[in-house]
Amino acid sequence: NDFFFSRHNEFWRRNAEKKLPELLSATGMLACGEDLGMVPSCVPGVMAHEKILSLKMRGMEGEGEWNHLSVCATSSHDMETLRMQCDTDPQPWEVRNMLWEFLNSPSMLAIFPLQDWLALDAKLRRPYRSEERINEPADPHHHWRFRLHLDIDAIREASSLNVTICGLIKDSNRYIIK
């Protein structure tokens, strides 16, 4: 246990403090660290010091205890979509409420898979939520097989969905007029 959880913390911290500033200064991009699961205990402190956004996912530890230096998401490509995470297939109004919670979080960014946005419209989302998953790492025959069932024109022309999405974003004050 000591080998995995504490013996190498100082090693990882020193190396991160040496390498990260140079990497971060090489670009003007905002950095986000994938800090989910088993990570050395020094990681949150190093990320905060370097102003690297942490990743916050629905159902993961510390849900709802997010600060501004984070990206919140309903799921990732390796997880179940929002509809799949629920015991029963949620109605569009329930999906709206769940997305609203994320949009109202203090996280700097809120990023959702397209499947979760489409779940706001019963006619546009897939009929079976089990078909929405992008990747299932535990299944060697299910790698990256997801294909969107709509073309971009159908999404662009879905005025009700687009009005709903724009309203959620504007009402959460994540919308900036330029």
For the regions a protein language model found, what residue spans apply to each?
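Catalytic cores of glycan-processing enzymes that make or break glycosidic bonds
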Residues: N1-K178
